[in-house]
Amino acid sequence: MLDDAPALLKDKNFLDVLHNEWNKRIVGEITAREIIFAMGLGGCLCLNAQKTSNNLIVNSKSGSGKDYLTTQVLNIIPGKESKWIKRTRITKTAFTYWHNSTIEPNWTWNNKIFYGEDMNSEMINSDVFKVICSGENYSTIVKDQKAIDLKINGKPSIIITAAKAILEEELLRRFAVLNLDESKEQDDLIIDFHSKAAMNEGLLNYDESVMKALDGLKPVSVIIDFADKFGKYFKEMNANVIVRTNYNRFIDLIKYSAVLFQHQRFWLDGNTIKAEPEDYDRAIEWFTHLFKNQCLIPITKDQQKLIQIVQTLGQTTVDEIISEVTFAGRTWTYTNLNLLTEKGLLEKTRIDDESGFSKKKLDTYTATGQTKIKLPYWVDLE
């Protein structure tokens, strides 16, 4: 612990204090708030995490408040435009020219958060965006019929919101998907919250002393000396190759928690701290909120709805599925049936058309069944 650290950062109820601040502007979504904050600030300050572990998509239908929630969570971090940078509209090549290292050689994305609001599939799946999401340093563009290498300095935490984005397979390895609460109960909480605000002076401002205290967090490396205790539980999952990426993501969530609580951790040297069991338990909560099944495949709310439709119908044809999909169009449904089949969440079978109108084969889909992810808390570790 550093003696000169702000008192807030030495408080075991540090996150509760932050929730009290967020409660001034947000209602519900307790775990979602923590994930956005941890992957944003903890992610950009962790020196020895995987470069893709701090990439997050906040997903929910249009009008659900995902942009508002994400903005209000990040607003508690001081240094907007210096420590965290928000853009509402951005082109797919912007990162190639933005803070170009030729013009700004000393500028870096390290220790920063990039928040992209309402990004579309074209932008998310673009080559340049893949480069920065991977933490790679160079992209090549063609200008005046010449190939030019441009350097991207550093790697930020990347948080984006999206309603209908379709992630290509390559992006699935680089992003976790945070699905928000779309329940009637959450709707009612939001209505009551804004009604109360309207009866008073509106939304309250965050306490500046709390915001300033967050400046006391510094970039550190994290050692997990108990990491050999939980790997076996991931080996038991039916997660195929993606377990390699998401196991590292789980490890890094432990590290992000330790980074946020660094002034309550043992310092091995001036730049390295040790994670504690409570960091493991916190990572369990965050990880099982992000990944609902043992396949460890990130899926959006709409993709989950599509799986549930197929599950309800049993073995069923594309036309029957499309007639039940009221939240998206035919093209989206075709695309996502194929994507979910590739991920192993649906099974595709060709059968004879028994209607008598055609001799063609029909594609049918069946839900494979998803086993809910279960990971033990520290007290239950063997």
Residue ranges and their predicted role:
Residues 173-239, 251, 258, 267-270:
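Interdomain motor-coupling "hinge/lid" segment immediately C-terminal to the ATP-binding subdomain
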Residues 21-25, 29, 39-43, 76-80, ...:
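Conserved, well-folded catalytic cores of nucleic-acid-processing
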Residues 297-382:
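Terminal-proximal interaction/regulatory segments of ATP-powered molecular machines
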Residues 228-299:
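C-terminal helical "lid" subdomain and adjoining coupling/linker elements of P-loop NTPases
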Residues 1-33:
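Charged, amphipathic alpha-helical linker segments immediately N-terminal to NTP-binding catalytic cores
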Residues 74, 251, 334-338:
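Short, hydrophobic-biased segments on the C-terminal half of alpha helices
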Residues 34, 39-197, 348-352:
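Conserved ASCE/P-loop NTPase catalytic core
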Residues 33-37, 169, 173, 244-252, ...:
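Non-catalytic, well-ordered alpha-helical scaffold segments
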